[in-house]
Amino acid sequence: MLERYEGRRLLAAPPWPFFTPEQTRLSRPAWELPPIAGQGCSGQASSHASIPAVVHQPWLHGGALKWEHILGMLSVRYVLRPKRYKLYYDKAPAPSPTWRCACLIAHCVQHSAPTRVPGNTGKRLKMYHWPDVMRLQLLLKHGGVFVDHDAFVIRSLDDLLRCPEAPVMAGFEQVSASATDRKLNPGVMLAAPNATMLRLLLASWGRNYSTEWDWNCCSRSYAVHAAHPGLAQVRADLGPLPRFRTKQDYHDHLKRTRVVHATAISHRWRRQELRASGLLRAVRDIVLTAANTSMGEAEWELKACAARVGAYVDHTF
């Protein structure tokens, strides 16, 4: 089983369960997290400047948002609680309840998408890479936080923003016990404006552009990080949701992580996993409790959005 994944990049979800006992033993230090003791800066003050509590989220190509995306947006607004929250679109989706809710939760701003490879303007980016480059450009210019639309914030990030351990922090991903499978997953990324690591990451696209889905944004990004220690920190508590053996393992994960990043949430295998574990229902309860506690009486439209999300998760997950 281990030989099947050793040194290979996975192109599809592996059979359930993902980790064999041997893989679990070897990879545990990479993704298993200690309980979070509490909020606030630990030890001495950070030597790095604080990161702006501003969230930038692109929504490109004009597609329709799903209710799980709205749950993610509610988690950003009411659990992360940024000072500003912007949703950038290049082409407005058709009017729909989800688009209306999205623009109630965040400030929707039209913004052109990057279509050319950074540093190589003669080469066009694949459309699925537009958001990857755009997130780096927005964070480089403004600083702040990027949260992908399949990620759900379940615990405050205030201490990381106030006392960052590096100018850039992102998710850690390891899809097998092989060191070659390590990735910097930018599905959740915190960054100071003008961070050197962001410039290096953007430059790496121009030098080594690949049309593979995540080679530049994840695999190549980890190589850049490894070559420049101290400029970034990769963290398992900001990384993608691992695949666990039991339902209890998934719920124990909620006690250890800050974000549930359910990558590939539109794929059947992931939806089956979330349904079987009940994990998204647990996330829904955390997020809607925070949202309903914060919403005022006048915010009846937002309350209606939250109610629609709750009913959708009950029915679908």
Region locations from a protein language model:
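Small-residue hinge/turn detector
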Residues: D132-G144
